[in-house]
Amino acid sequence: MKFIPFTLSALAGGLVAALLVVMLLRPAPPADVHPVRRSPGEYYPAAAPVAETAPLPDLPAAAVDLRLAARRATPTVVHVDARVEGRDRATVKALFGREESSGTLGGEGSGVIYSADGYIVTNYHVVQAADNITVTTADRRRFPATVVGTEPKTDLAVLKIDARNLPFLELADSDAAEPGQWVLAVGSPLGLVSTVTAGIVSAKGRNLSLLRDPDAIESFIQTDAAVNPGNSGGPLVDTEGRLLGINTAIASRTGRFQGYSFAIPSELVKRIVDDIIQYGSYRRAIMGVEISSLMPADQQRLGLRDRTEGVIVDAIFPGGAAETAGLRVNDLIVAVDGRPVRDLPDLTEIIGRARPGDRLRMTVVRENKSRELTIDLLPAGN
């Protein structure tokens, strides 16, 4: 049995040699990758840094749970039934797209309770030309509603019912909304009351040329939450159950949802609705210009270097705020109060949310040089 010590010595020597070989042959980490210790004796390369425009909030590891948002939003959503009497049948059917077997003409949609004392927000096209409007709340109470005011250029309307202590939603900051975040659409699509659908924000600042007025304000939040006829006027809410927008339109070749729906952002809704409640109408501020999104032809015509976004000033109205501020035709507006202006919807929303008398700081590019101008907005009609 004397050979045992020699055997153990040989095994030990072999193990040491093997470890040395492994360590020598193991490739060193690249210079820009730092080993991170996971547990004693174990290392792995750290992931390469990812470029981010802003830090993201801590997100839960579990799947997104939208039940709380649905519980908060559903009681605040109403069904709006708008009926018309004594008008041309063909005209009204074209407006509302509905004719019941009883011969009654009208339309229906959704709305969201804006305040506990009975103010309700919906779309203008839901109640347009209606003589009798009935609102049904989530608990199946029915109320006659009156129109407080409308703003066709944004497709918004405010209704009032005689009720108190109604549930309503906190407003979300639509400026902070980002593509990829979860949202819910709540309403009465195809007559199915209190329907909740989910999706994500797909894009912001969409202009569909849906509203025919030349100075209409279109800067929609685009989502892929299913929205169908009857959803119009209902809320788009975030995962906290806060009002992020008013569902208004779908992009479809069939008249039914095909993956694209659009909502008026909450910050614009608040600005217009608060005016309607306080004054009976929206008090709009104007610049006194004609504007359009920057196009490749404009870049070439004006010799703009390294500029692919912004809004071109096409005309200036005499005596308007823009003329007083020193704005000129062919100026390229690229920012307002530090907020970037990519295209026409960005600027129309910014001006639409401003009030007459507000002073804005505009960054413009003129002859390839950036400059700051201060503009004092005037009320519409001046």
In which residue ranges do the predicted regions lie?
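Short strand-turn-strand beta-turns centered on an Asx-Gly dipeptide
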Residues: V336-V341
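Short alpha-helical segments in extracytoplasmic peptidoglycan/chitin-binding modules
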Residues: I333
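Serine-dependent protease modules
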Residues: K2-E309, D314-P318, A325, L344-T348, ...
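Conserved catalytic motifs of ABC-family nucleotide-binding domains
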Residues: N330
